[in-house]
Amino acid sequence: MDIAGLPSDILVEVTASIATRSATPLSDIVNLRQSCKVFRDATAARKVGRCMAVHREWRLHWWDKARFLSVLRRCATSGNPEASYILGLEEFCNRRREASGLRHLLQAMEHGHAAAAYMIGMITLHDSLRSPGGAEQALERLDCFSSAPASAGPSRTRRGMASVRREAVSVMRRLTLRRWRMAEPPTPCANPWCGKVESKTAEAWDGDGDDERWFCSRTCWWKHEYCNFIDNI
């Protein structure tokens, strides 16, 4: 059968699979688009943009940042959570467009992106430490994220949180040379046992091993996580 005779939905599925699994998804999709009319139409489908593995195109960020951001915007418009996540951090950290950045991060979170939820929490807590009375609102938001389904929020288990933190830190390091500074170090807890190590964890090869610690409250738990994040970026 001639390829032009295949149903359009099958062509879209094939193209989306390439966008998802390819090591070089952008160049492969561009080549496919240029090959014939039927694939040009298939590559324009929203599903292809939604499935594009944009995290495999970081080299484009250094070679042609304008094109990289253009690809992210098109994919984010199609509902690609990773594209929304990276674009949100770019807007927030590099372009100082806080409202736009948070909007993209929220869009990613709504599509189940755990690192986006984590970053919204860290941003909220970071900002709250600059203003009296803001910490409680930030902590309520963080608890909302952590109590969400596993696909939509960061896990409160040590390993789950460390994994999400690594992902967030990795993107932050790739996107910007700017580093966050604590507006004000969190007030130490009066409980002498709060934050004490319960069980020692062997240091991971990447230096990101987390010990099991006991905290007296959700406030102290999140403040410790915030300090961990700042130290890593």
Question: What are these model-derived regions, one by one?
Answer:
Residues 88-97, 126-131:
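Short coil/turn linking the two alpha-helices of tandem helical-hairpin repeats
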Residues 120-129, 153-182, 186:
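TPR/TPR-like alpha-solenoid helical repeat scaffolds
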Residues 78-81, 111-114, 127:
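Short helix-capping/linker turns of helical repeat alpha-solenoids
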Residues 85-87, 118-121, 135-136:
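Alpha-solenoid helical repeat scaffolds
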